[in-house]
């Protein structure tokens, strides 16, 4: 596809020589992953009248179009905690002779606490924006334009439940001149089927079961904006904004198109708290509730380089998910958690209670609001071995709970500061060149769920939380 190839070359007749234009062209051609060698050669026209004109010849050497990879690694998925995961991928980088990338991935994970996840993912990427309107012309100052189709089938098995999900999405991705990366997901359709193990679900609070564990259809659209000015020699920063909406279009069509309503065993409609009906949609001959919510998050990170061996990393993140209309509660896997290897490292993932709610070791905690701030001092030890000292502060909350027993989980402005949880700790990082193996030991110093919140006198290794992960936490 010569037109698609030409769109990756930003050199134009008559423009002044500019090295950045050639660098941008080289980067765009490399992004296609179709060439093992790319080179530019320049020559000057041998003419007195055109002595200031350069001719650029571009040489492209075709590379392998098919690649495969097999990976085995330690997983830090917050739902799986620590465990072993593996994947096998097969890729074709020119499947339709237009630098289209097709990737098929099979993956599986096995947690040390009897939690398994297996699935398959298909990604089909076109290196341009495919649309009825000429988006390429509107965004002619952008690079790395992509249209992405994704489909997946995932099964998660926990002692408490089995969750099967099937999803498909259609997205655009592009980067502007200012290095802002945009991702617009026009639609992402997911069907989640939940089957509970009654014996184990008895160990989980009724509040959590009623809120989160149900089969449902999730239609979403989302937009993500991110920016990173990564620089190993200077201070750098990272910014990410995400907003996601689910179900509003279906809800607006439910009444005009006479969607079915959720009913009880007596055939009476089950109404929302405001008296509105709950509509369902037929998925594979089964009536399922479709979700309706809005979710947004903001993540900012700053990396202060003190010198070659010492640096300070700061992260602050705030998120909100609010269910309305057709559903009172947000899907379990869309909500926020606290604890684990990447934020409040003094707690296990899912084990940090929302707000000042009392801890229950048999409950998996989630929240509709999250705020976390972490500061980490990073320093070199010996060769590839590095160390860190950190402090994490934050929590998760529910937006509202009608159950008085869980009132302490609700977010209240006048209790926000008092319900901030704090941990401190230290860790080691070993650089294996291709990845970084990380271990952290976290100690809870402030627990808002306890009457005596400060835990300085209880700091010891018996009360610590060990975390292992790949890469830096942020």
What residues fall within each predicted segment?
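Outer-membrane beta-barrel pore domains and translocons
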Residues: 12, 43-45, 61, 73-77, ...
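Transmembrane beta-strand segments of outer-membrane beta-barrel domains in Gram-negative
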Residues: 67, 115-127, 131-317
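Transmembrane beta-barrel outer-membrane domains
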Residues: 20, 33, 49-51, 79-83, ...
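Periplasmic polypeptide-binding modules associated with outer-membrane biogenesis and secretion
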Residues: 1-74, 107-112, 139, 294-298, ...
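Extracytoplasmic gating/loop element in the C-terminal half of outer-membrane beta-barrel translocons
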Residues: 54, 311-390, 394-404
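Outer-membrane beta-barrel "beta-signal"
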Residues: 430-435, 460-474
């Amino acid at each position: 596809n010569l037109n698609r190839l030409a769109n990756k070359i930003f050199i134009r007749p008559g423009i002044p020589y500019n090295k950045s234009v050639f660098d941008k062209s080289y980067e765009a051609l490399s992004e296609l992953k179709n060439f093992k060698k790319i080179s530019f050669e320049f020559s000057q026209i041998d003419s007195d009248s055109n002595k200031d004109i350069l001719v650029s010849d571009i040489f492209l050497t075709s590379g392998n179009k098919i690649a495969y990879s097999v990976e085995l690694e330690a997983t830090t998925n917050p739902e799986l905690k620590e465990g072993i995961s593996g994947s096998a991928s097969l890729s074709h980088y020119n499947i339709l002779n237009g630098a289209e990338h097709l990737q098929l991935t099979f993956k599986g994970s096995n947690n040390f606490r009897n939690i398994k996840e297996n699935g398959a993912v298909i990604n089909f990427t076109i290196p341009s924006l495919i649309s009825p309107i000429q988006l390429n012309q509107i965004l002619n100052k952008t690079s790395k334009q992509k249209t992405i189709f994704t489909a997946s089938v995932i099964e998660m098995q926990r002692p408490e439940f089995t969750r099967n999900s099937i999803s498909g999405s259609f997205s655009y991705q592009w980067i502007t001149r200012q290095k802002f990366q945009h991702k617009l997901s026009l639609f992402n359709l997911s069907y989640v089927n939940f089957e509970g193990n009654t014996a184990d679900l008895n160990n989980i609070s009724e509040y959590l079961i009623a809120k989160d564990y149900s089969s449902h259809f999730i239609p979403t659209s989302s937009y993500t904006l991110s920016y990173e000015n990564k620089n190993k020699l200077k201070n750098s920063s990272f910014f990410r904004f995400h907003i996601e909406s689910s179900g509003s279009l279906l809800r607006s069509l439910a009444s005009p198109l006479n969607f079915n309503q959720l009913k009880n065993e007596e055939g009476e409609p089950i109404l929302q708290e405001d008296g509105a009906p709950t509509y369902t949609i037929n998925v594979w001959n089964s009536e399922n509730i479709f979700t309706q919510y809005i979710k947004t998050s903001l993540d900012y990170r700053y990396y202060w380089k003190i010198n070659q061996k010492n640096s300070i990393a700061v992260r602050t993140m705030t998120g909100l998910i609010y269910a309305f209309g057709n559903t009172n509660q947000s899907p379990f896997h869309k909500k926020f958690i606290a604890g684990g290897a990447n934020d409040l490292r003094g707690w296990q993932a899912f084990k940090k209670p929302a707000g000042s709610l009392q801890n229950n070791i048999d409950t998996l905690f989630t929240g509709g609001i999250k705020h976390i701030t972490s500061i980490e001092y990073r320093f070199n030890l010996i060769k590839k071995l590095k160390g860190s000292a950190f402090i994490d502060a934050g929590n998760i909350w529910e937006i509202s709970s009608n159950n008085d027993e869980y009132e302490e989980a609700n977010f209240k402005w006048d209790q926000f500061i008092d319900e901030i949880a704090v941990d401190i700790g230290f860790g080691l990082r070993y650089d294996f060149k291709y990845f970084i193996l990380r271990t952290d030991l976290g100690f809870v110093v402030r627990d808002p769920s306890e009457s005596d919140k400060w835990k300085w006198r209880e700091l010891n290794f018996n009360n610590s939380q060990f975390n292992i992960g790949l890469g830096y936490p942020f």
